[in-house]
Amino acid sequence: MKITKIEKKKRLYLIELDNDDSLYVTEDTIVRFMLSKDKVLDNDQLEDMKHFAQLSYGKNLALYFLSFQQRSNKQVADYLRKHEIEEHIIPDIITQLQEEQWIDDTKLADTYIRQNQLNGDKGPQVLKQKLLQKGIASHDIDPILSQTDFSQLAQKVSQKLFDKYQEKLPPKALKDKITQALLTKGFSYDLAKRSLNHLNFDQDNQEIEDLLDKELDKQYRKLSRKYDGYTLKQKLYQALYRKGYNSDDINCKLRNYL
């Protein structure tokens, strides 16, 4: 087969053959196989050229994808599939990128966890799930997590939550709120509980009473649209008790309120 035309098309070159076949190749392919118009190729040379062209094009795509941020092996492989790189070529591209240190799942996991320590608010369980979703294996994640101390981060997150809700909730409800939030963010129950030790949950009686008054007004506006009489009183009691207020304080308020 003879090359009848070589035409540059943006990042690729269009190669046309005298058997009406055509294909796109990278500049690396042109150089490697010394392609030029009227060059004759046998079947083996053509197949080698096609394989290398796919490999070269796929690698260029991967490098473009990696230019924005670190990616896992799986993320790069999925990106190549999306751009229709042949499946049997993808492992070769991944291997080359690993050898040239463009991708490294262990390093990615380490960077992700360290960045979270500096600027994030996630505990180890959520971090592991997010890294698993990126296709990083547990054996690359677990050693890094086990060597990372999350106690300071848990304290920072708990302090932020404390500052946010301190003037809105009574002590018991505030503790429960912070604990549940930390669990949701992936911290262990033990770490969530220990992070509360540096917080001051003391509130004087007047502060608690003011909070109770505000919450009672809020719940009354909401529940009085549907209920009245004894049922309304029951619903108000239940709502306030769930918020963490003392049973005696609630009953006292309800007697004077209704």
Swiss-Prot record:
Major location category of this protein: cytoplasm
Cysteines engaged in disulfide bonds, as pairs: none
One Gene Ontology CC term in the entry: cytoplasm
Biological process, per Gene Ontology: regulation of DNA repair
Cell location: Cytoplasm
InterPro entries: RecX_HTH_1st, RecX_HTH_2nd, RecX_HTH_3rd, Regulatory_RecX, WH-like_DNA-bd_sf
Keywords tagged on the record: Cytoplasm
Gene3D superfamilies, A to Z: Winged helix-like DNA-binding domain superfamily/Winged helix DNA-binding domain
Function statement: Modulates RecA activity.
Family that this chain belongs to: Belongs to the RecX family.
Name of the protein in question: Regulatory protein RecX
Taxonomic lineage: Bacteria, Bacillati, Bacillota, Bacilli, Lactobacillales
This protein's encoding gene: recX
